[in-house]
Swiss-Prot record:
It holds the Pfam family Homeobox_KN. Residues 71-132 bind DNA. One of its GO terms (molecular function) is RNA polymerase II cis-regulatory region sequence-specific DNA binding. SUPFAM superfamilies: Homeodomain-like (SSF46689). GO terms for biological process: cell development; muscle organ development; regulation of transcription by RNA polymerase II. May act as a morphogenetic regulator of cell adhesion. Residues 19-54, 159-189, 245-301 are annotated as: Disordered. The gene is MKX. Keywords: Developmental protein, DNA-binding, Homeobox, Nucleus. It is found in: Nucleus. It comes from the Eukaryota. Belongs to the TALE/IRO homeobox family. It comes from Homo sapiens. This is Homeobox protein Mohawk.
Length: 352
């Protein structure tokens, strides 16, 4: 670079060429400066390519974690979708060829398309054939022996949700079942609580019978039951019963408390009680009012007993017209002036 210098004394202009010195100064290599002992110490900055490699490796690890999570999520989703198909395959292991209607139902249950369901079953059958290469084997035996022949990281026969490599079939413990027990339904909670499968089948009925609560036994229901049992016994031993009831009427009447005790007590006999039975048919045409008046205990109120006999006669006439149908009247005498009349229609046995 040229420099113009003005000389005040002579007024001459001098031209100096400073380019050479600058060129010499600028031409010095920087390596000498860097190599000099006075240069600043090096800062611990790694070179460019290793830094890029570290960043790329770190990015690769982060992406691998994200991709691994996506893969696991996708695998779990596929397992959930294929679970209904696995269950169907295990139930129909003897003939794993679903019809079109069954494929449509499975597609709706597994959120797959009809083509995906068909492909899934085709792949499952092909996998069973390729894994268990023994000829002349049924599908049930192939499914049973699949886990024994599978190798490596191939799919196992499992429908459990925590199995990460399941594609088709059923749980391995179930494949070890005997062939005779294939068609038996499996109820895990019931089998665990019971000792055998038979008990598991009987348990719901017994539990239902235990949970059933009988209605309260009022006096009316007890009285009807007691009358029915007594009537059968009276019809079987008519002659003996009539004699005993006559003796009972002559001996006197029970009080109301004794009657209730006799009614509630299960050990009480049909002959012991303040009951008067009279069994007859419509074809003999006997006067019911007279027989009831003869068999009742001694009473001074004739009008009262006439009303009772008339009510009994009207009740007997109002009941069916069948000749084989008879009635049995029961007079419950609680005291000398209070009585109840029970008329029960029962089929009478023809006497030969």
């Amino acid at each position: 670079m040229n420099t113009i210098v003005f000389n005040k004394l002579s007024g001459a202009v001098l031209f100096e060429d400073g380019g050479a010195s600058e060129r010499e100064r600028g031409g010095r290599p920087y390596s000498g400066v860097l190599d000099s002992p006075h240069a600043r110490p090096e800062v611990g900055i790694p070179d460019g390519p290793p830094l890029k490699d570290n960043l790329g490796l770190r990015h690769r690890r982060t992406g691998a974690r994200q991709n691994g999570g996506k893969v696991r999520h996708k695998r779990q989703a596929l397992q959930d979708m294929a679970r209904p198909l696995k269950q169907w395959l295990y139930k129909h292991r003897d003939n794993p060829y679903p019809t079109k209607t069954e494929k449509i139902l499975l597609a709706l249950g597994s959120q797959m398309t009809l083509v995906q369901v068909s492909n899934w079953f085709a792949n499952a059958r092909r996998r069973l054939k390729n894994t268990v290469r023994q000829p002349d084997l049924s599908w049930a035996l192939r499914i049973k022996l699949y886990n024994k022949y599978v190798q490596g990281n191939a799919e196992r026969l499992s429908v459990s949700s925590d199995d990460s490599c399941s594609e088709d079939g059923e749980n391995p413990p179930r494949t070890h079942m005997n062939e005779g027990g294939y068609n038996t339904p499996v109820h895990h909670p019931v089998i665990k609580s019971e000792n055998s499968v038979i008990k598991a089948g009987v348990r719901p009925e017994s539990r239902a019978s235990e949970d059933y609560v009988a209605p309260p036994k009022y006096k009316s229901s007890l009285l009807n039951r007691y009358l029915n049992d007594s009537l059968r016994h009276v019809m079987a031993t008519n002659t003996t019963m009539m004699g005993k009831t006559r003796q009972r009427n002559h001996s006197g009447s029970f009080s109301s408390n004794e009657f209730e005790e006799e009614l509630v007590s299960p050990s009480s006999s049909e002959t012991e009680g303040n009951f008067v039975y009279r069994t007859d048919t419509l074809e003999n045409g006997s006067n019911k009012g007279e027989s009831a008046a003869n068999r009742k205990g001694p009473s001074k109120d004739d009008t009262y007993w006439k009303e009772i006999n008339a009510a009994m006669a009207l009740t007997n006439l109002a009941q069916g017209k069948d000749k084989l149908q008879g009635t049995t009247s029961c007079i419950i005498q609680k005291s000398s002036h209070i009585a109840e009349v029970k008329t029960v229609k029962v089929p009478l046995v023809q006497q030969f």
